[in-house]
Amino acid sequence: SLLSLIRKLIT
């Protein structure tokens, strides 16, 4: 999901 992608970028 989008959240997962965003989280990945943040982490």
UniProtKB/Swiss-Prot annotation:
It is found in: Secreted; Target cell membrane. Keywords: Antibiotic, Antimicrobial, Cytolysis, Fungicide, Mast cell degranulation, Membrane, Secreted, Target cell membrane, Target membrane. The natural peptide is not C-terminally amidated. However, amidated synthetic analogs show a much more potent activity in all the biological assays. The keyword rRNA-binding does not apply. GO terms for biological process: defense response to fungus; defense response to Gram-negative bacterium; defense response to Gram-positive bacterium; defense response to protozoan; killing of cells of another organism; positive regulation of mast cell degranulation. One of its GO terms (cellular component) is membrane. The keyword Iron does not apply. It comes from the Eukaryota. Expressed by the venom gland. Its main location: secreted. Linear cationic alpha-helical peptide that acts as antimicrobial peptide. Has antibacterial activity against the Gram-positive bacteria S.aureus CCT 6538 (MIC=40 uM), S.saprophyticus (MIC=40 um), B.subtilis CCT 2471 (MIC=40 uM), and B.thuringiensis (MIC=40 uM), and against the Gram-negative bacteria E.coli ATCC 25922 (MIC=80), E.coli CCT 1371 (MIC=160), K.pneumonia ATCC 13883 (MIC=80), and A.faecalis ATCC 8750 (MIC=40). Has antifungal activity against C.albicans (MIC=40 uM). At high concentrations exhibits activity in stimulating degranulation from rat peritoneal mast cells. This is Decoralin. The lineage of its organism: Eukaryota, Metazoa, Ecdysozoa, Arthropoda, Hexapoda.
